[in-house]
């Protein structure tokens, strides 16, 4: 019997079956007539969220794709994906886990807007804990504090459309989705 967490092996490696209606269009794409590429330095002592959002908003960037090139954090908090106990979705995030001081090896973060229009940063990263263990997961950006040295981030603005959290009927969870300019609030 198949359920939301069943892995199907039909001639392909590990196919995950989401509980909602299947959407044959896997990538929702939008065209942008232009984009800005820049390098940003996250400032020490600030949360990852504030260090990323505030300077980008000051430049008029509300949606972006970023690559965090690595650096030290005085405090690092993350979650991991666990099976959703309710069965409504494939996964749910664990309770936040504190790694204490950590060295981010590499991460990707997406800047967009919540349903109410406030900023959101969705970030996944690989990092090394103070005891040397390698970990990875969903980063709680508001709780991660940049360490003593600035951290370099490569930014590509997504001009001409925005990323906004909206309910996804296939996964049954809210996801960042591209919306064209006429949908901007």
Predicted regions and their residues:
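Flexible, glycine/proline-enriched loop segments at strand-loop-helix junctions
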Residues: 36-42, 139
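Structural beta-strand/beta-sheet cores of well-ordered domains, especially the beta-sheet scaffolds
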Residues: 36-38, 62-64, 123, 149-151
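Short, well-structured hydrophobic secondary-structure segments
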Residues: 41-107
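Long, charge-patterned amphipathic alpha-helical coiled-coil/hairpin "stalk" segments used as oligomerization
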Residues: 92-152
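Mixed-charge, glycine-accented linear interaction segment located at domain edges/termini
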Residues: 128-185
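N-terminal, Lys/Arg- and Ser/Thr-rich interaction peptides
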Residues: 7-36
């Amino acid at each position: 019997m198949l359920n939301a967490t069943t892995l199907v092996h039909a001639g392909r490696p590990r196919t995950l079956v989401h509980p909602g209606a299947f959407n044959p269009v896997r990538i929702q794409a939008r065209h942008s007539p232009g984009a800005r590429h820049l390098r940003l330095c996250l400032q020490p002592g600030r949360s990852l969220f504030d260090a990323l959002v505030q300077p980008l908003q000051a430049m008029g960037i509300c949606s972006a794709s970023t690559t965090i090139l690595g650096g030290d954090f005085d405090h690092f908090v993350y979650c991991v994906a666990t099976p959703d106990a309710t069965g409504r979705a494939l996964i749910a995030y664990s309770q936040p886990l504190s790694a204490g001081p950590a060295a981010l090896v590499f991460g990707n973060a997406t800047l967009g807007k919540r349903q109410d229009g406030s900023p959101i940063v969705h970030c996944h990263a690989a990092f090394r804990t103070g005891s040397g263990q390698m970990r990875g997961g969903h980063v709680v950006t508001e709780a991660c504090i940049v360490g003593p040295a600035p951290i370099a981030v490569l930014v590509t603005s997504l001009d001409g459309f925005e990323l906004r959290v909206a309910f996804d009927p296939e996964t049954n969870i809210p996801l960042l989705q591209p919306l064209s300019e006429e949908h901007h609030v």
